[in-house]
Amino acid sequence: MSNSFVLVINSGSSSLKFAVINSVTGEAVLSGLGECFGLEDARMGWKYSGEKTEIAIEGEDNHHKIAIGKLVGLTEELGLTKDIVAVGHRIVHGGEKFTSTVRINEEVTAEIEKLADLAPLHNPAGAIGIRAAMEAFPALPQFAVFDTAFHQTMPKRAFTGAIANELYTDFGIRRYGFHGTSHYFVSREAAKMLNKPIEESSFISVHLGNGASVCAINNGESVDTSMGFTPLSGLMMGTRCGDLDPGIIEYLLKKGWSQEKVFNSLNKASGFLGVSGLTSDARGILEAMEQGHEGATLAFQVFTYRVAKYIASYLAALDSFDGIIFTGGIGENSLPIRREILKNLKLLGFVEDEKGNEDARFGNAGVIATSALLNAVAMVIPTNEEFVIAQQSVELL
C-alpha cells in the first residue's frame, strides 16, 4: 500500500480543488485548483514536483466537467494513474442521512442533491463534481466524506434547538455542525502528541480560517460545535456574522430590506469585513491595527473575545480536559490572535510559551501554552482534511 493514492476532489460552485494524496503518508503528490468557473477567465493550475503550471479552461459552460476531464490526461501524463485506487469527494452537508463516509452510487448522489436546501452553495456543486468524476474515472470506486458526519455523535441536548418540535420533525432544523473532517484529524494528532489514546482524551478544537468553528471533543467524539443548521452561526468569521439575535432579521425586513439583501449582508458583508469596514482577511486586520485603524482593532477584539467565550463554555460539555487545539489558516499561523484568545482565558490559568508560540507557525505543530490549574495545554496542529478523505476512502475499499 506504499503507493496507494487517492484523488481528492472538493467541488465548489465556481471552483474545483483537487489533490492526489498518498493515503499512508498524507503527502500531496499533485495539488491544484480550478477557479472562475462560469466566467470567461476560467482557469486551472496545479503543482507537481515543485513546479507550477496554469492553463485556461475554454468553453462557455460545463467547466467542472472539462477540468476533471483534463485531470484524467494530467494524471496519465505524470504517471500517477496506475497508483490511484479511489476518488474521494468532500461533501459539505450529509444531514442526518449520512453519518460516515459512503461509497458513491446513483442513490447516494441523488440524496446529496436532495440536501441542497441545507447547503445551497455547496451540495449542488459537490454533486456536479461527483457526476463529472464518475464519468471521467468510471473504473475507480468513489467515496463521499461529509463535513457534518463527525458531529453526528452530538447528544440531543446539544443538537436540539429551543424551538417548536415540528420544526425539527418536519424540516430537519437542528444543529449539524461543519469542519468535522478538520476537527476529527487534529484531535487524533493532538492525542498522539500527548501520547494518549484518542478514546481517553478530550479537547476543544478551534478551527480558525475565513470560516471558523469550535468543537468540543469528548473521548474522540464530537459532543458540541459552534456552527449550527448552516455555517453562518457560531463564531464571527471573515464575512459571516456568527451568532446573532434572529429578531434583527425581522427588524431589517420591516425597514424595507429584501430577504436577499439581509442574508447577503449576514453571509458576505459581516464578520471581519463588516466590523472593520476594511477587509475580511485576518492578515489585513492585523496590519491595519498596527497603523491604529479603529475598525480593525475592534474587529480583532470582537473576534478573539468571542472565540474565548466559546472555548470557556465548552468546558461544560467535557468529562475531562486535555487542551485547546488551534488549527485552520488563522489558528495555525496568527500568533497575535492565539495570544489574545489565551489572554482572554486568564481564569483558566494558561501561561504562554513565547518561543513555542513563535515556532508553531507555517506548518509546524507544537505546544504554545500550559495550564497548571487544569493540567492542560494549548497547541497548534496543522489540519489535513485531504489526508482524512484519502484514508477513509481507502478504508472502505
Curated annotation (Swiss-Prot):
Keyword Ribonucleoprotein (UniProt): no
Keyword DNA repair in annotation: no
Subcellular location: Cytoplasm
Covalent S-S links between cysteines: none
Residues engaged in binding Mg(2+): N10, E385
GO biological process, one term: acetate metabolic process
E.C. number: 2.7.2.1
Annotated binding of ATP, by residue: K17, H207, L208, G209, N210, G211, D281, A282, R283, G329, I330, G331, E332, N333
Entry's Gene Ontology cellular component terms: cytosol
Active site: D147 (proton donor/acceptor)
Site, as annotated: Transition state stabilizer: H179, R240
Residues at which substrate binds: R90
Main subcellular localisation: cytoplasm
Single GO molecular function: ATP binding
Pathway(s) it belongs to: Metabolic intermediate biosynthesis; acetyl-CoA biosynthesis; acetyl-CoA from acetate: step 1/2
UniProt keyword list: ATP-binding, Cytoplasm, Kinase, Magnesium, Metal-binding, Nucleotide-binding, Transferase
Cofactor (UniProt): Mg(2+); Mn(2+)
Subunit field text: Homodimer.
Family: Belongs to the acetokinase family.
Job of this protein: Catalyzes the formation of acetyl phosphate from acetate and ATP. Can also catalyze the reverse reaction.
HAMAP family: Acetate_kinase
Name assigned to this protein: Acetate kinase 2
Organism encoding this protein: Vibrio vulnificus (strain YJ016)
